[in-house]
Amino acid sequence: MQISRRSKTFCTFLLALMLSPDFYLRAEPSSSQARPDDRREIALSAEERSLILGGKIVLRDLPSAGSIGRTFEAIGVLPGSLDEAFAVLTDYGSYPEYMPNVGALKIRAVAGASSIVETTLYLPLGFRKQYRLRYTSSREDSGFLLSWEKLPWPELKPSQTVTDTSGYWSVRKFEGGGNLAVYHVYTDPGPVPLGLTNFFQGLAKSSFPDGIVKLRERIRNLYRPGR
């Protein structure tokens, strides 16, 4: 079948557009698993509240209806102001300096409150995973929300990336003092080497609170060194 020059030109243009990060700044999210609700109230039990006020981190293993992946939520108090927490979390280029498992990161595009970021995770046993995320932030007087969803990265093989991941940071003023941070993540890692499924699931759950721990340390080191 003969393909006209006009058709070839259009196909080339369409492919280039789809491979451009700017295209995904306008695209719809690929996942609905961890879409945040700005109005969501975090309900804490008396025990959870006591733990959080004592500086502990509450870990929740949430149901992921109709999906293969897992959803975890860590809740804890951050030091400092909302402005400080927002500045640290939206400084994506610094993630490799403190975020667990983040080994490399490249910011591909920025448009207003949205950024396209390509991340490489360094995992135990020599495994590496890469993915492209769209981060979107929003602010109000009482707090802020930073959400992300996975975007297509056609150059990667399935074994080089995860099937899906999405999530958000919700940080709001806490009546008990400081700022209450909710770190919510859904991940479907895709195929896992035979016999290692339980290992990686256990590792993900046990290390998940480290996200808040490292964020606390980063805020203190930048704004309150020596305290």
Give the predicted meaning of each segment.
Residues 2-13:
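Bacterial N-terminal signal peptides that target proteins for export
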Residues 58, 154-206:
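Beta-strand/loop substructures that line and gate deep hydrophobic ligand-binding cavities in soluble
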Residues 62-69, 96-97, 106-161, 187-188, ...:
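Glycine-rich portal/gate segments that line the openings of hydrophobic small-molecule binding cavities
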Residues 76, 135, 182-185:
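Short, hydrophobic/aromatic-enriched beta-strand segments in well-ordered soluble domains
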Residues 76-83, 89, 93, 162, ...:
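Soluble non-cytosolic domains of exported or imported proteins
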Residues 85-86, 95, 171, 183, ...:
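Hydrophobic pocket/interface hotspot
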